[in-house]
Amino acid sequence: GEDMAKIVVMGAGIGGISQVYELRKALGKEHEVVLVGDSDHFEFTPSNPWVAVGWRKAEQIKVDLPELMSKYGIEFNGNGVRRLHADDNRLELNDDASLTYDYLVIATGPKLAFNEVNGLGPDGYTQSVCKTGHAATANLDFNKLVADPGPVIVGAAPMASCFGPAYEYLFILDTELKKRKIRDKIEMHFVTPEPYIGHLGLDGVGDTKSMLESEMRDRHVHWTTNAKITKVEDGKMHFTEVDDSGADKKQHELEFKHSMILPAFKGVDAVMDIEGLTNPRGFILIDDFQRNPKYQNIFAVGVCVAIPPVNATPIATGAPKTGYMIESMVTATTHNLANLLQGKEPDERGSWNAVCLADFGDTGVAFVALPQIPPRNTNWASRGKWVHLAKVAYEKYFLHKVRAAKTEPYYEKTIMKLIGVERLKESR
């Protein structure tokens, strides 16, 4: 009847899975909830650095979706979206089928813009931990490094916005190479567009600058900041170091045996260049309530939303979207969609708080920037073994959540408590 709405969630990552479970729980049975992914499985992206060094097998962080979704009353389609036709409330799928919706939640994550640097990425000469398949390939390359040690370059491309995993991978790699007693045979270099170590796209958080610099010194890692990677060849990286005004200062060429570089992100092709829906890089424009101002039946959550950079940097960088932000965007979207279905206006805002756990294998760094965009009332970072343990717990919890259709927000409940406890310890 007229009271039934069809809600489609586009993207089956951390945001999309959480979104369908919350919607299914919050909305009456008369409403239809559909999940569209671009494959038949979910992968837990935060664990990809562990896959790259062999601490996890890809299968351990993947979950098959079709049976699960039908078990929980959610329709599933794994064919992926070729194009969104927002004016017709319709998704054109990769198999030419069409899927119509009353409401759409876009949770696609990013398109990985490897093509912006010649030779970058899994089809070029560097590794990636952005997808689990990439991380599995990186593991093969890592094994070659172990068999025949040589220089390593880790870092991020210009316009990158997600730096945490680059630091994670650098330090996890260092930890694993020490375990294998070959760290002394390997020069490690970190190449980043950040204006300083620990900027993280957030203009630093608490003491991340000195904390991460000292971590690098302790681990004998060289670094170049304000670095713009221009080209990658087989075993050789070209990058330009700029000064604070952004003018070229020095050209560098570095040889490598193994390299993992995080690419810049863009919006996925399916939404590119839809006027009023996306910004020029394809990220979804949203209001305070996660809703697109032009297409009022479209919401967006996660890495695909447009948020402004925290500050201008000599080489353009973006601000990260962390697990805590994604979780709070999902919760706000569920509430606001439910309001619309009841004829009310959206009124819940997601919290733009950067809370990140960066695991270094033996230790780690947690940081909290509340709100993410300064001026901040909380700006705190801490280093310790507890971060590694918290990250392992988050992985276990989330994979369980996916399999059991749980909806409790983990950061809200567990991580924030843990951080509260750590902050209390430090203030005593």
Stretch-by-stretch model annotation:
Residues 30-34, 75-88, 99, 174-285, ...:
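A Rossmann-like FAD-binding core segment of flavoenzymes
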Residues 5-75, 158-202, 419, 427-428:
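Beta1-alpha1 glycine-rich phosphate/pyrophosphate-binding loop at the start
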Residues 349-366:
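Flavin (FAD/FMN) cofactor-binding core of flavoprotein oxidoreductases
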Residues 3-4, 73-168, 172-181, 249, ...:
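FAD-binding core/adjacent interface of flavoenzyme oxidoreductases
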Residues 367-428:
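C-terminal auxiliary extensions adjacent to catalytic cores
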Residues 113, 121-148, 255-328:
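FAD-site-proximal beta/loop scaffold in flavoenzymes
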